[in-house]
């Protein structure tokens, strides 16, 4: 079984190589620690055993391990402007053998690798084992849940790469995709107003009832919508944001939100 206390110690040792006082480094450390906790909560809610719960928590600590090098090398969290942080993370862990410091048994390694590689994809790849697929779902949900926390509690400019809060509107293409398909094509995102739709679309990509309840209890969707309306200056953007929120409420018949 994985020694989760050793995982925590070695994670702390690894991130000590970076400037923890730097805003984005600090943000990412805190995000990773929360995602690990949420992953364990999801596993427990699914009645997984102790070994599986610890594995889920461990994946939480590893899922964004590539972010630190990404910021150091490219000064951004934007994959499109740098590198795929999930692939970078697996290179650091497995190709550069950082994984050896954590004393992770071989039987867990492929599950961990698949979970990291799939946590930031549009959808989980096909051909995975049942166990690999399960842990991919857990980390994807846990990551999205804490992204809402980050959005609602950190500056947009620091947490992401929002710079322009004067965009006039979310594109009609994005709005139509969201309302008709309950998803968006990331290639269609052209500006920061279009980016607004991304967290809303996350809701349709959550796998577990626990995750929907978690969002509701913390009122993240309403908080996010209100924050967007506070940050962006365009009345059109405000209207569209509330339209996206309403679409979610209708879709779920307000069962959760």
Where are these regions (language model features)?
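Acidic/His-rich, divalent-metal-binding segments that scaffold phosphate/diphosphate chemistry
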Residues: 1-87, 129
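Generic alpha-helical secondary structure signal
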Residues: 2-5, 9-12, 50, 87, ...
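A generic short-segment signal for beta-strand/edge and adjacent turn/coil regions
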Residues: 3, 25-28, 80-85, 104-108, ...
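A broad, low-specificity signal for short, low-complexity segments enriched in glycine/proline
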Residues: 18, 100, 109, 158-165
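Divalent metal-dependent phosphate-bond-processing catalytic cores, especially two-metal-ion Mg2+/Mn2+ enzymes
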Residues: 23-29, 33, 37, 41-49, ...
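Acidic/histidine metal-binding catalytic segments
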Residues: 47-58, 99-117, 131-138
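Hydrophobic/aromatic-rich structural module bridging two neighboring secondary-structure elements via a short loop
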Residues: 68-111, 122
């Amino acid at each position: 079984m994985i020694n989760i206390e050793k995982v925590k110690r070695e994670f702390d040792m690894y991130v000590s190589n970076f400037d923890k006082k730097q805003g984005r480094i600090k943000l990412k450390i805190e995000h990773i620690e929360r995602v690990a906790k949420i992953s364990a909560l999801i596993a427990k809610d699914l009645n997984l055993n102790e070994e599986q719960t610890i594995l889920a928590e461990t994946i939480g600590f590893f899922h964004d391990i590539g972010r630190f090098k990404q910021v150091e090398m490219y000064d951004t969290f934007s994959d499109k402007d740098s590198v795929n942080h999930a692939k970078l993370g697996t290179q650091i862990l497995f190709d550069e053998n950082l994984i050896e410091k954590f004393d992770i048994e071989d039987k867990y390694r492929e599950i961990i690798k698949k979970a990291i590689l799939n946590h930031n994809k549009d959808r989980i790849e096909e051909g995975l084992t049942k166990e690999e697929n399960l842990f991919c779902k857990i980390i994807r949900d846990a990551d999205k849940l804490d992204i809402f926390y980050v959005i609602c509690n950190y500056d947009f400019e620091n947490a992401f790469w929002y710079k322009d809060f004067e965009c006039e509107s979310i594109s009609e293409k994005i709005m139509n995709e969201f309302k008709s398909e309950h998803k968006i094509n990331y290639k269609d995102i052209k500006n920061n107003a279009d980016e607004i739709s991304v967290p809303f679309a996350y809701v349709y990509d959550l796998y577990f009832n626990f995750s929907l309840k978690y969002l509701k209890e913390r009122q993240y969707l309403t908080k996010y919508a209100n924050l967007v309306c506070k940050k962006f200056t365009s009345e059109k953007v405000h209207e569209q944001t509330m339209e996206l929120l309403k679409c979610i409420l209708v879709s779920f018949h307000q069962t959760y939100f």
